Amino acid sequence: GYNLSKSYKSLKALDNVSINCKKGEIIGLVGANGSGKSTLFKILLGVLKPDTGNVTINSKKTKPIGGIIEKPALYEYLNAFENLKVFGRIQGLKITNDFVEESLKKVGLPVDRKDPVKNFSMGMKQRLSIAIALLNNPECLVLDEPFSGLDPMGISSLNTLITTLAEEQELAILISSHILGELNKICDRLTVIKNGKIIKSGTTRDIISQSTVAYTIAALDISSSLVLKKYDTTIKNNQATVKISYTDISELLYKLREENIHITSCVPEVDMNKLFEN
């Protein structure tokens, strides 16, 4: 999308927003409620028309872009198989049983489950919605808050699916979420939107690093470290939270390894106020 603007009466929901996503790339969109994320996604999917600007997708396919906006919109009284058949026909596809089975397998859903989707977990509903979004083989996928309502296992499983779609099918994927830690794991680039304007855009590492105020380091023997005593550190169980900048964290991790501290994870703690500073 290029130079996209959209107003609702006196409210400017989007103000000259430009965003791009390449084949095989995952772009994360970060913003508070009311920042313009859903409006942007609706414009990209053709649900809304922008007041100014345009959406360009380099694709000759029948459906160049697919997506989920907010909660999955499914026929709750139908099973997964039947949902795919209905949505396939709506999109003008000739649906065979083999095609439906392949679509379900692609997103990791069982092909033999016959009960209505109202019985499905939120994670399974998200997967089914993605299968529907992928009908007609679009080259771009837009996911608005796909982790909402999922437990940690469901989030991890969905992350794996998203990265697989980007890597193996070379889909361009644009995803929004309030869970910054998950975007940090899977996104190549991050874009920060505030009051309808893009205020930051860059590699995930750069955007996260600029707003990081501490790191939480996990290791079974972390409390035995002498190096950590030189830093502003809080140790609880097998985790140490260290107030340190991203420019110094690599050196600290090196020193911990020299002490034979077996690190299992190192997670940045982001100051959200800093992230949303213009």
Report the location of each language-model feature.
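Catalytic Walker B motif of ABC-type/P-loop ATPase nucleotide-binding domains
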Residues: 141-145
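C-terminal coupling/interaction segments
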Residues: 244-278
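Conserved ABC ATPase "signature" region
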Residues: 85, 89, 95-112
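Conserved ABC transporter NBD signature motif
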Residues: 46, 53-65
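The feature captures the beta-strand-to-loop junction immediately N-terminal to the Walker
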Residues: 30-32
